[in-house]
Amino acid sequence: MKNIFLHSLTLENYRNFKNLELKTDNTPIILIGENGSGKTNILEAISLFYPGRGLRSAKLADICKASEDQCLVKALLQSKLGLAEFTTQFKRSSNRRITEYNESKIANNELSKFTSMVWLTPQMEGIFTSGSSDRRKFLDRIVYNFDSKHAELVSKYEYYMYERNKILAEDIRDDNWLKIIEEKMADMSSHIANNRLKTLEFMQQAIDELENEFPKADLSIDGIVEQKILDGKENIVNFITAELYQTRSKDKLLGRTSFGVHKSDFLVKHQKKNILAKFCSTGEQKAILIAIILAEMNYAIKLTKIAPILLLDEVFVHLDDKRRGYLIEFFTGLNMQLWVTATDLEGIENFANKAQLIKLPIIL
């Protein structure tokens, strides 16, 4: 098994940190500090070495330290391709982000070729009651760990969708170019939908096989394209192309693309109660979310032979002793780099004995 882990992390003008340098190894790491000390900021900085905008989905302008125009995150990381240096820089004035791998520029969506990462934060606990976009992005992040090309597919699909919307809005009479764009979107849609379905099959198997202290869930996706594939629809690309063509007038009026894989919803049911997670209690929703993360970790390692970096923000809070103990045993048994935030060590004393402790002062 190959482990993805950080050897070092450097922050410059990042959030509340002027300068911070951490040296780490392939072990559990506990960030200890009061609220406001920057624990979650460190996890967010690490998450930027994975496709997307990090675990907060923050705007670039919010990431740089107040009064500073630019900031930097640098990591020496044991990647899928070996030891490498990664940097990501932000410039507030130009609203630009530049990411580099061994001093060569790479696209953000290429990061899944090098890294693998899973995170769980308090903000995610509302994912079952929020909009479908949040759940869909959550599912796609899971897919990244099974298929490193998925992030690039999603990014390109969104780009061509933007181009299509622009052509329709500006009334550019170029049917040829519009046809090419829609054909590209259809081809990518087919791959995206198939990747999601394949990953859900893996995940469901992992959930059903893994016996733990958390409720089992039934996973599915509510989307026209995905359902057509499940129904055995032939020539799915032609079907999508035809739908995009037929909705041109409607989409011109709406100012957006009304059909496609960007409209799909990730559905989660409490298996025993047979009700959607959004109708469960907040405690049950958190437990179901943890169960999904456990399944993702377990099956990603089993299938890809790669252990991702795991980021857990205040996850042990409000868990009973039994569930807390199970999580600690599960995660330490995986022999991977795990980052945990906590205000104190109460309830995780035994875990702390096996971890690297990093104490953070409050930075005023």
Swiss-Prot record:
Q: Which UniProt keywords apply?
A: ATP-binding, Cytoplasm, DNA damage, DNA repair, DNA replication, DNA-binding, Nucleotide-binding, SOS response
Task: State the Gene3D superfamilies in the record.
Answer: P-loop containing nucleotide triphosphate hydrolases, RecF/RecN/SMC, N-terminal domain
UniProt xrefs under SUPFAM superfamilies: P-loop containing nucleoside triphosphate hydrolases
Query: Is Flavoprotein tagged as a keyword?
Result: no
The record, for Pfam families, names:
SMC_N (PF02463)
Provide one Gene Ontology biological process annotation.
Answer: DNA replication
Where is ATP annotated to bind? G33, E34, N35, G36, S37, G38, K39, T40
Its transmembrane ranges are none
* Compartments (UniProt record): Cytoplasm
> Where the protein is mainly located, per its record?
cytoplasm
Q: A single GO CC term, please? A: cytoplasm
A GO molecular-function annotation: single-stranded DNA binding
Q: Please name the PANTHER family in this protein's record.
A: DNA REPLICATION AND REPAIR PROTEIN RECF
Describe the function of this protein: The RecF protein is involved in DNA metabolism; it is required for DNA replication and normal SOS inducibility. RecF binds preferentially to single-stranded, linear DNA. It also seems to bind ATP.
Provide the family line.
Answer: Belongs to the RecF family.
The name this protein goes by in its record: DNA replication and repair protein RecF
The source organism is: Rickettsia felis (strain ATCC VR-1525 / URRWXCal2) (Rickettsia azadi)
> Which gene is transcribed and translated to give this protein?
recF
